[in-house]
Amino acid sequence: KAGRLENRSGDLVDRAPRGPDGSGGRGITIGALTDLAKHRGVLGDPVVRQAMIRLHILGEVNRWNMLRAKAGAGRTGGEGNMAKLAMSELVRQSREVGNLVNGADGMLDRSDSSSGGIVQEMTLFSPAPSIYGGTDQVQRNIIGERVLGLAKEPGPAKGTPFQDLPQN
């Protein structure tokens, strides 16, 4: 990353890879956030630095857990559900740190923003991972019931047809 310090942050953000690199699907990479923070003059701010380190740690732990799950030799437990929860949290934290670094530029349109709009795009996208593929609450229920062996939520829903359930 040291060879990119003189580049404009917008150039780096546009080329930032998306996906299983720890950026959380549509997140922003730590390298791109670092460059943006330097460009905006907030890299020396201890609050920004601590938030960026926490995001980096979350990304690394998620990456290690994915590697551990892949090496599980066909064993299936709650790894996929936990990875989904971790990814949702990673995208939420990417949004928070991106907006912390971007500051008031977060209100600007893509072409006017120092981030080139990637932080704004991530902000708009960030609720999606906690919804698609089963909400975070559903994932937690699956982990609790199937992995930890906890009892299911009590209620009439188990044997009752949907049409017969009480309406709000």
Regions found by a protein language model. Give the residues of each.
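Alpha-helical interface subdomain recognition
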Residues: A2-N168
